[in-house]
Amino acid sequence: MEPIRTIESRTVVIPRENIDTDQIIPGRFLKVTDKKGLGKALFSDWRYDAGGGPRADFVLNGPAAEGCTVLVAGDNFGCGSSREHAPWALVDYGIRAVVSTRVADIFRNNALKNGLLPIVLDPASHAKLLAAPGASVRIDLASQTISLPDGSTASFPLDGFAKYCLMNGVDELGFLLSQEESIAAFETRSKV
């Protein structure tokens, strides 16, 4: 997992509310266990027509979305069924952070375990981002802040352990394995 300290990017905005995991990646793509290539299936039913051609009216198909690593979405992003493929698809596409006013709990946990930063903002700060598609933002994970189009910044909550893992590019298992010597020393000192 690639460490996240700061993210500087233009935003891509999908203002829809209640974007569920089946919309993020439809169920027909869930038969794979390899994360690579899932970015092609991201928002597949919105991005492509019945013949597989790109829909010109979907934001990710336009030149303005090229290179954007911050997705700003409507309220309640990632709701619906639990599928780890949803953050896999976002990360494989190149998204590093998702910004909303609410992120579903299971999606948030899956995102954090896969190097995707879910940011929950207050409605006023979020509205500034929704109103400015393509705005340049800077996310500073250490201070837990994101710059807004008007030059102000907004803070966002994040669990300390999740923050540590993201900043160091490790998942929970990777962290545990990095503590192997300390665990062995503790077990030696604390024999039962």
Curated annotation (Swiss-Prot):
Subunit composition and interactions: Heterodimer of LeuC and LeuD.
One Pfam family it belongs to: Aconitase_C
Segment forming the signal sequence: none
EC number(s) stated in the UniProt entry for this protein: 4.2.1.33
InterPro entries with a match to the protein in the record: 3-IsopropMal_deHydase_ssu, Aconitase/3IPM_dehydase_swvl, AconitaseA/IPMdHydase_ssu_swvl, IPMI_Swivel, LeuD
Transmembrane intervals: none
Statement: the UniProt record of this protein carries the keyword Amino-acid biosynthesis: yes
Keywords: Amino-acid biosynthesis, Branched-chain amino acid biosynthesis, Leucine biosynthesis, Lyase
GO biological process, one term: L-leucine biosynthetic process
Family: Belongs to the LeuD family. LeuD type 1 subfamily.
NCBIfam families: leuD (TIGR00171), PRK01641.1 (NF002458)
Name of the molecule in the record: 3-isopropylmalate dehydratase small subunit
GO molecular function, one term: 3-isopropylmalate dehydratase activity
Function: Catalyzes the isomerization between 2-isopropylmalate and 3-isopropylmalate, via the formation of 2-isopropylmaleate.
